[in-house]
Design a protein with these regions (language model features):
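Thiamine diphosphate
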Residues: 40
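Short glycine-rich phosphate-binding loop at a beta-alpha junction
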Residues: 29-37
Length: 170
């Protein structure tokens, strides 16, 4: 795609700047934390990606940054973590989401180094990504790619209709 050559941090910084511009009543110093999920936090997506994005977006130094790694669900996990901190009263304003450019990181990361204390195959599910999980579900349960795509499309259609109907408003 058109963004394949663009670094993930460049994209993330622009998204955060755009978010701040869309909510002018939110002052940068009111942001308590920036939590970013990243499946492969290495190369330009590493070294505390959350703080890198916070600084790059112009948030002041006291705004902390955190990187969450839960592979494919990293972005969703960052939002869940932010929600928990706010509900617990530990923070008032947190920017959270996922940021990644998969075009820049080889599948599986740069160098795969499984735990040498385990015999390969002894812990088969530890290193399984969502892509492989989908393949296994398809093979084990006879679900075709077309069926998966149709399910995903219907799920998105239902979500869109629920949003239009106001079902996600508080």
């Amino acid at each position: 795609g058109g963004l394949a050559a663009t670094r993930g941090d460049q994209i993330g910084i622009q998204v955060i700047k755009g978010l701040m511009a869309r909510v002018p009543q939110l002052k940068p110093e009111d942001v308590d934390d920036l939590i970013v999920g990243c499946a492969f936090p290495e190369a330009e997506q590493g070294m505390n990606y959350g703080k890198v994005l916070a600084v790059g977006a112009g948030l002041p130094e006291p705004v902390s940054g955190m990187t969450v790694n839960r592979f494919c669900s990293s972005g969703v996990q960052s939002i869940a973590d932010a929600t928990a901190k706010i509900r617990a009263g530990w923070s008032d304003v947190i920017i959270a989401g996922g940021c990644e450019t998969m075009s820049h990181i080889p599948m599986g990361g740069s160098i795969f180094r499984p735990n040498p204390d385990w015999k390969f195959g002894e812990q088969p599910n530890v290193y399984v990504s969502m892509g492989i999980t989908a393949e296994n579900v398809a093979a084990n349960h006879g679900i075709s790619r077309e069926d998966m795509d149709a399910f995903g499309l219907e799920s998105n259609r239902r979500a869109f209709e629920a949003i239009k109907a106001g079902k996600f408003k508080e």
